[in-house]
Design a protein with these regions (language model features):
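Structured alpha/beta reader/binder surfaces that contact nucleic acids or chromatin modification marks
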Residues: 1-174
Length: 174
């Protein structure tokens, strides 16, 4: 049974919280206060939006932590994907996941089958309904020139990575 309160997080970060060992969700103090965010068990909602530059930067950032997320067309969106406990809210942390200015410290992730639902800002009471966000054209061809994945299969023993970090699609560059 999922908790009644949920937090909407954009992919691939929602996936990383549930499956990839991401132990801090970064937010501003204003977002935490206005969103009613406190400690306790919450559901994680994968937000509906995802732009190619967001995914590209997120996948690169996760790989720096040794976490390799699924392709964008394999990440559910507009759905609850699991639950996690918020154990504290911090303004500083030595965690590699902390980007500030504040962070929700997370523990005990439990995945669930995706449950379509509409998200909202801050903590929100979720209700099942709607549909998963559709796979977008750019997602179908991710890392597949010609749509056939031939390039990725040429050198299966090499890690897929970027020579240079892709540009951060939001906020200041860290």
């Amino acid at each position: 049974m999922l908790p009644a309160l949920a937090l909407s997080v954009r992919q691939p970060w929602a996936w990383a919280i549930i499956h990839g060992g991401k132990v801090i969700e970064n937010r501003t103090r204003g977002a935490i206060e206005s969103g009613g965010m406190t400690t306790g068990r919450i559901a994680i909602h994968a937000a509906g939006g995802l732009k190619e530059d967001e995914y590209r930067w997120g996948a690169w950032r996760l790989a720096k932590h040794g976490v390799f997320c699924p392709r964008p067309d394999e990440l559910p969106r507009s759905a609850l994907i699991g639950a996690v406990s918020v154990t504290e809210i911090v303004e500083t942390s030595d965690s590699e996941w902390f980007g500030g200015p504040c962070g929700l410290v997370l523990a005990g992730p439990e995945p669930c089958e995706p449950i379509p639902a509409t998200g909202a800002l801050g903590y929100f009471r979720w209700e099942p309904g709607g549909e998963l966000a559709p796979v977008l054209p750019w997602m179908r061809h991710w890392d597949r020139p010609g749509g056939d994945n031939a390039t990725g299969e040429l050198f299966p023993d090499l890690d897929r990575s970027f020579r240079e970090p892709p540009p951060k699609p939001f906020g200041s560059r860290r």
